Amino acid sequence: MEEKKQKVTRRKFVKGSAIAVAGAAGAVAMPNIARAAPVTLKVQAAWGGGIFLENAKSYVDRVHAMAGKDLKIDLLSVNSVVKTSQMQDAVHRGVLDGAHYVPAYWYSKSKAASLFGTGPCFGWSAQELLGWIHYGGGMELFNELMGSLGLNLVSFFNSPMPAQPLGWFKEQIKDASQMKGLKYRTVGLAADVLMEMGMSVVQLPGGEI
């Protein structure tokens, strides 16, 4: 019922507007009303494939379903425009409209970033992380972190990841002393923890392995 009233009101408005223009301007032609071109956002993901890229595509599909033809997200794979470590600054400068990645990838800017995703192994679950973000004050702290870094960004947390597993090793690890000297790849706070344990850690985004 509400939709029907809305259509009638719109029809009357268009008719009244046409009459008003013709009366005021005499022989003024009314142009065809063209549909506005859809807004396209250029968003780069930190993933070259796998489940993380599928998560990004799923997010894009949901946005397209809600926005119809008015909004389009052009999802770019890892390193398409800038390196993963440069994505945050690229969005801030307007080189990219958005980025799909984890905060721990800019750990070099602030170690606090790792508190918002990709923590050390045996940490909290993805559900616990989102609960803290949305109901425990995490989002406010994240926005405060953005402000302290001077970044003009608006973030939305989606596709949460659980804490990463400790890893896969050539030999069974039975004692922490066996980890000394092992070469290990990770990102974020886990890197500092494992280096304290004597491991040789390389911080490298997953999409660049």
Model-derived segments and spans:
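Short, polar/charged alpha-helical segment
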Residues: 50-74, 192
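Short, well-ordered beta-strand elements
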Residues: 37-50, 71-75, 181-185
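N-terminal secretory signal peptides
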Residues: 1-12
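Alpha-to-beta junction loops
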Residues: 69-71, 87-104, 183-185, 199-201
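Contiguous mixed-secondary-structure segments that line small-molecule binding/active-site clefts
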Residues: 2-4, 61-64, 102-206
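Cleavable N-terminal signal peptides
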Residues: 23-24, 33-34
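Extracytoplasmic "Venus flytrap"
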Residues: 24, 40-59, 78-83
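Short helix-initiation/N-cap motifs at beta->coil->alpha
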Residues: 76-89, 187-189, 201-209
